[in-house]
Amino acid sequence: QKVGGLSTFFWQIDFPSLNFRLPFWVIWEDQIQGMLYWSTVHWSDPVRDVWTDPAFRNRYNGEGYFFYPGTEAGIAGPVASIRLKVLREGIEDLAYLKLLDQLGEREFVTTQAAKIASSWWKWNDDPQQVYLIRAALAQKIMEKQGKSEAT
């Protein structure tokens, strides 16, 4: 919940999708070695329809699951949530940050990352800014690898 009046990243359906992407920028800032999410398919009742009743413990919508049963969508197998796809984008952002660091651009990376998220309680909630910074990271990677333009 809120800590001393500060917000942090909440990972439920009801919150902006950036909440699933930006923790990886903080992971870079704090040089954390990994991230563990407690469950991706936790349904407290096996007969419950998570498509129409998404609450975990009757209050946290989408908490504990990133995959849904595909049967309701006519798919034989699991369906990935949009939250999971945004989480993947965050992991890809972290890969860009780490690659640039390995290419000798730590100062550039640190400066760019600080523009997005400098702590668990302070981040930029403008999605456009995230895309612009990611494009700048991609361009710098291409330059360092001797390629002319990022695609």
Where are these regions (language model features)?
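Catalytic domains of carbohydrate-active enzymes that cleave complex glycans
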Residues: 32-33, 47-151
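Catalytic-core regions of glycoside hydrolase
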Residues: 1-48
